[in-house]
Each structure stands twice: as C-alpha cells, then as structure tokens.
Amino acid sequence: MIIAIDGPSASGKSSIARELGVRLNYKFISSGHLYRIITLIAQRSLMNSCDFISEDSLLNLILENDISFNNFAFLLNGENVENQILNDKIDFQVSFYSSYVGIRNIVNKKLREVVKFSDDNYIIEGRDITTVVFPESEFKIYLDASVKVRALRRYKQRNGNETLEELERTLKRRDDVDKKKQYGKLKLSKGVFYLDTSYKGLDDVCNIIIEKFNLKKVRER
C-alpha cells in the first residue's frame, strides 16, 4: 500500500507524512530529501556554493557518490546528512536542480526501487509524487497552504539569515518554477484528496486524513 502526498514547499508534507507513518505504522519517504542530497553533492563540488553546475556534470557526480535508503532516511555515502540539507542555501538551489529531467529520472527510479523490493506499506511525500512517480497509489493527497502561512512555518523552523519577507519571495519563486517545469510540474492529479492546511494544526490534519483514508477503505470493500 502506498499513500502519496503532494503539494507545494512548506505545505506540511514532511511533518504530516512522518506523523501519519507513526499512526498507521507505515514507512516514511521524502523525495524532497533526495533532491536536497543531490543539491548538496553539487554544492560540495564547487568552490562557491552559490554557483550552479550543468546537468551532465551533476549526473557524473551522482555516479561517484552512493545514495542509499536505510531506517527511514536516505544516506549519502553512508552518512545521514539531514542536518546539512535543511538550510537556506539548499532551498535556493534545489528547485533549479530538480528541474533537470535526468535528475528527476534518477530520483523517481530510486523511489520506485525502494518500494518495489519491499513488502512494507509506505507514505511517500514530494512534488509530482501523485502525478508522475506513483500515480497509481491507493490514496493520493494534495496538501496546500497560503504563501504567507508557509513562509511563517519555514521561518519558525529555521534559524537562517532570511527574513519572513525574503522567505515569502523565495517560496513564490519556487512555486513558479515548480508549476512551469517541463517534466514533473506541480499540479493536482485525478482522484486526489485536496486539503488546505493553512489554519489547521498537525493533529487536526492527520485526523482528517486518517478519517478520509478509513472511509475510502470501507467503500472499496
């Protein structure tokens, strides 16, 4: 069983997916973490982490590194780098690198391989998860929230250098990039359960989703 969660950046996908995983005893995967790890690989290869590298160069770098999945996390060369990928510098570049078709193909293949060779149930979150990666998943969710709310959430999560206004601009720019991507653009898929989380807490959102999920299972019996 796969529960797929889609939606824009900072809409609550990761927090909600993690909590649902605990409540439902499902394994949690974030495709966004994979793209962030790849962005970290790119940044480590450059003298100036604000520069960008070409798609071909990045594809070659990925081959030189080992990205694996273990205990609910993607590892880079055996190291859990989560504390190195959730920052403003990664935020600024990840949407650029995730627009490379070759990079998206690698990430999508990696995600499908993890699920294919496992008998576990999964909650997988990320942009285009419901439309491209797992469009056939049994339960599809699209989480949304206003830009102001999403910026405030990210501001509270981070101790970075960006102001609230700068975060709003960053999220608007990223939304624009994600919605205009040639491949894997951000959009609603057919049969998705849409939920605006702007003024809902984590518990409320999870309760709504679980109620909808259980109702769906009853109807399909």
Swiss-Prot record:
Q: Look at the named UniProt entry and state the broad enzyme category this protein falls under.
A: transferase
Q: Name one Pfam family in it.
A: Cytidylate_kin
Q: Which residues make up the binding site for ATP?
A: G7, P8, S9, A10, S11, G12, K13, S14, S15
The EC number(s) given in the record are: 2.7.4.25
Name the catalysed reactions: CMP + ATP = CDP + ADP; dCMP + ATP = dCDP + ADP
GO BP terms: pyrimidine nucleotide metabolic process
InterPro entries recorded for this chain? Cytidylate_kin (IPR003136), Cytidylate_kinase_dom (IPR011994), P-loop_NTPase (IPR027417)
List the record's Gene Ontology CC terms alphabetically: cytoplasm
Cell location:
Cytoplasm
Specify the superkingdom: Bacteria
Keywords attached to this Swiss-Prot or TrEMBL record, sorted alphabetically, are:
ATP-binding, Cytoplasm, Kinase, Nucleotide-binding, Transferase
Q: Does the keyword Kinase apply?
A: yes
GO MF terms on file?
Answer: ATP binding; CMP kinase activity; dCMP kinase activity
Q: Which NCBIfam families match?
A: cmk
Q: Which family does it belong to?
A: Belongs to the cytidylate kinase family. Type 1 subfamily.
Listed HAMAP family: Cytidyl_kinase_type1 (MF_00238)
Name of the protein in question: Cytidylate kinase 1
- Organism this protein belongs to: Borreliella burgdorferi (strain ATCC 35210 / DSM 4680 / CIP 102532 / B31)
